[in-house]
């Protein structure tokens, strides 16, 4: 029991937080700085912006920010190329328009409109 408490104490005192971001290769990623006076530790080009934000080019990279209070924020960017899966998802959305439920509701609305128009003409 003492060992478990000791290990949890070590984990909480190290204060290392991990952040994961997935992006499309070649685009720019906009992230928020974890602390305003942090020290950047990494080999990727870092572009500080207004409102405690920064921009990085999306490549598979690993970098960190060390804050003044001792907290370390580790970031992992995972670059992916555009895959055909994105286009498959769009086709699935278009097919949902012609689902059986939609067709049943459309047929009912059509029949109701036909009967109400027929009654008005009589």
From Swiss-Prot:
The keyword Transmembrane applies. Disulfide bonds join 23-58, 35-67. The keyword Membrane applies. Keywords: Disulfide bond, G0/G1 host cell cycle checkpoint dysregulation by virus, Host endoplasmic reticulum, Host Golgi apparatus, Host membrane, Host-virus interaction, Inhibition of host innate immune response by virus, Inhibition of host tetherin by virus, Membrane, Modulation of host cell cycle by virus, Signal, Transmembrane, Transmembrane helix, Viral immunoevasion, Virion. A motif (Di-lysine motif) lies at residues 118-122. Gene3D superfamilies: SARS coronavirus X4. GO terms for cellular component: host cell endoplasmic reticulum; host cell endoplasmic reticulum membrane; host cell endoplasmic reticulum-Golgi intermediate compartment membrane; host cell Golgi apparatus; host cell Golgi membrane; plasma membrane; virion membrane. It is a single-pass membrane protein; Single-pass type I membrane protein. Plays a role as antagonist of host tetherin (BST2), disrupting its antiviral effect. Acts by binding to BST2 thereby interfering with its glycosylation. May suppress small interfering RNA (siRNA). May bind to host ITGAL, thereby playing a role in attachment or modulation of leukocytes. This is ORF7a protein. The lineage of its organism: Viruses, Riboviria, Orthornavirae, Pisuviricota, Pisoniviricetes.
């Amino acid at each position: 029991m003492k060992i478990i408490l000791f290990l949890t104490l070590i984990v909480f005192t190290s204060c290392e937080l991990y952040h994961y971001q997935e992006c499309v290769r070649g685009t720019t990623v906009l992230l928020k700085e974890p602390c305003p006076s942090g020290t950047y530790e990494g080999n990727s080009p870092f572009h500080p912006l207004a409102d405690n934000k920064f921009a990085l080019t999306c490549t598979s990279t690993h970098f960190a920010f060390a804050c003044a209070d001792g907290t370390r924020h580790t970031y992992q960017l995972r670059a992916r190329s555009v895959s055909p899966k994105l286009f498959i998802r769009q086709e699935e959305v278009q097919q949902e328009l012609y689902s059986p439920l939609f067709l049943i509701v459309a047929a009912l609305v059509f029949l109701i409109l036909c009967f109400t128009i027929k009654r008005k003409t009589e």
